[in-house]
Curated annotation (Swiss-Prot):
It holds the Pfam family Pept_tRNA_hydro. Belongs to the PTH family. The lineage of its organism: Bacteria, Pseudomonadati, Campylobacterota, Epsilonproteobacteria, Campylobacterales. Hydrolyzes ribosome-free peptidyl-tRNAs (with 1 or more amino acids incorporated), which drop off the ribosome during protein synthesis, or as a result of ribosome stalling. Catalyzes the release of premature peptidyl moieties from peptidyl-tRNA molecules trapped in stalled 50S ribosomal subunits, and thus maintains levels of free tRNAs and 50S ribosomes. The keyword tRNA-binding applies. This is Peptidyl-tRNA hydrolase. The active site is at H19. It comes from Helicobacter pylori (strain Shi470). The gene is pth.
């Protein structure tokens, strides 16, 4: 089994903020597959079992995401872990993949690294840098950023669909990496 985790913060206060990119992409995937999340108090997360994947949205708040991930990872005895998360070191519209490595200062990844190790796959979605890291990651996208954000999130969702069917991280990485943002017609 593979644990596929979208990072974000629970509650309406943080809905659709830059830091909730992982939640939003998983929500879009679940909707397209005509599935739904259910809350698991055991893992303090919303989860959905689909094929041989456990899709998970930790409800611990970002800085404690590792608690939910570790709980689900141990319970389901998953072999692979893929984390979908925002990355402020990437421009808005960029989608990249990584296997292992550092957390880049991302508190959700720090929590996962501490409790689970840093040996997992990542789908990184660029949100660009802004003035003041905390304010920026907890802010919503500006209206003029929405078309590019939507295109990048759709691209990331399609990458996840490909991964669910192929179980091939390297093929997903080769096919879906966007080093530069997509061109959006106005």
């Amino acid at each position: 089994m593979t644990l596929l985790v979208g990072l974000g913060n629970p509650t309406l206060r943080y809905a659709h903020t830059r830091h909730n990119a992982g939640f939003d992409i998983l929500d879009s995937l679940i909707s397209e597959l005509d599935l739904s999340f259910t809350f698991s108090s055991k893992h303090n997360a919303c989860l959905c079992v689909y094929k041989d994947f456990i899709l998970l949205k930790p409800q611990t708040y970002m800085n404690l995401s590792g608690e939910s991930v570790l709980s689900a990872k141990n319970f389901y005895k998953t072999e692979e872990l893929l984390i979908v998360h925002d990355d402020l070191d990437l421009d808005l519209g960029v989608v990249r993949f990584k296997n292992g490595g550092g957390n880049g200062g991302h508190n959700g990844l720090k929590s996962i690294d501490l409790l689970c190790s840093n040996s997992y796959y990542r789908l990184r979605v660029g949100i660009s840098k802004g003035m003041g890291v905390i304010e920026h990651v907890l802010s919503k996208f500006h209206k003029n950023e929405e078309p590019l954000k939507n295109a990048a999130f759709e691209h990331a969702k399609n990458a996840l669909k490909f991964f669910i069917e192929s179980h091939d991280f390297n093929a997903m990485q080769n096919r879906f990496t966007l080093k530069k943002p997509l061109k959006i017609e106005s």
